[in-house]
Amino acid sequence: MLSPKRTRFRKQHRGRMKGISSRGNRICFGRYALQALEPAWITSRQIEAGRRAMTRYARRGGKIWVRIFPDKPVTVRPTETRMGSGKGSPEYWVSVVKPGRILYEMGGISETVARAAIEIAASKMPIRTQFVIAG
């Protein structure tokens, strides 16, 4: 699972996801990509599940680039705990994804294989996505 090696602060505000993605919304490395159409937090487990699904389907052919990284800690309070006494402890990591953001890229394989592999990865995501071709 992906997570930062070290961070400046252990806990973060939740923030809000306004507008569309201004960075990471163009295909840079591969020829085919999976693009987000909705805003969401995508966990490191979901990112890894999508990556594994694509790798398994594409087998040895092609290369995969993961364009998002989970750099936001999500804190969870223990169950049956009373209110107050501070914020919970960091439980897992998420990547803040806005509409237009490229999640995965693929290259070095045919379009039919890439489309099928990316569709499988898309089913692992908690948001609506679309298949994009460079150019």
From Swiss-Prot:
GO MF assignments: rRNA binding; structural constituent of ribosome
GO terms, biological process: mitochondrial translation
Single GO cellular component term: chloroplast
Localization (cell): Plastid, Chloroplast
SUPFAM superfamilies named among the record's database cross-references: Ribosomal protein L16p/L10e
InterPro entries in alphabetical order: Ribosomal_uL16, Ribosomal_uL16_bact-type, Ribosomal_uL16_CS, Ribosomal_uL16_dom, Ribosomal_uL16_sf
PROSITE patterns noted in UniProt: RIBOSOMAL_L16_1, RIBOSOMAL_L16_2
Keyword hit for Transport: no
Keyword set, alphabetical order: Chloroplast, Plastid, Ribonucleoprotein, Ribosomal protein
Coiled-coil portions: none
Entry similarity comment: Belongs to the universal ribosomal protein uL16 family.
Subunit description: Part of the 50S ribosomal subunit.
Protein name: Large ribosomal subunit protein uL16c
